[in-house]
């Protein structure tokens, strides 16, 4: 995930790479 979602999913605490 090389988009704005990349760091966001770590901030949410849910590393979703579906």
UniProtKB/Swiss-Prot annotation:
What species was this sequence derived from? Equus caballus (Horse)
Q: Would you identify the family this protein belongs to, as annotated?
A: Belongs to the POMC family.
Q: Which GO terms describe its cellular component?
A: extracellular region
Which GO MF terms does the UniProt record name? Answer: hormone activity
Protein name stated in the entry: Melanotropin beta
> Which Pfam families does UniProt cross-reference here?
ACTH_domain
Q: What does this protein do?
A: MSH (melanocyte-stimulating hormone) increases the pigmentation of skin by increasing melanin production in melanocytes.
Enumerate the InterPro entries for this protein. Answer: Mcrtin_ACTH_cent
| Sorted UniProt keywords | Hormone, Secreted
Subcellular location(s) of the protein: Secreted
């Amino acid at each position: 995930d090389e988009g704005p979602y990349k760091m966001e999913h770590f901030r949410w605490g849910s590393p979703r790479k579906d």
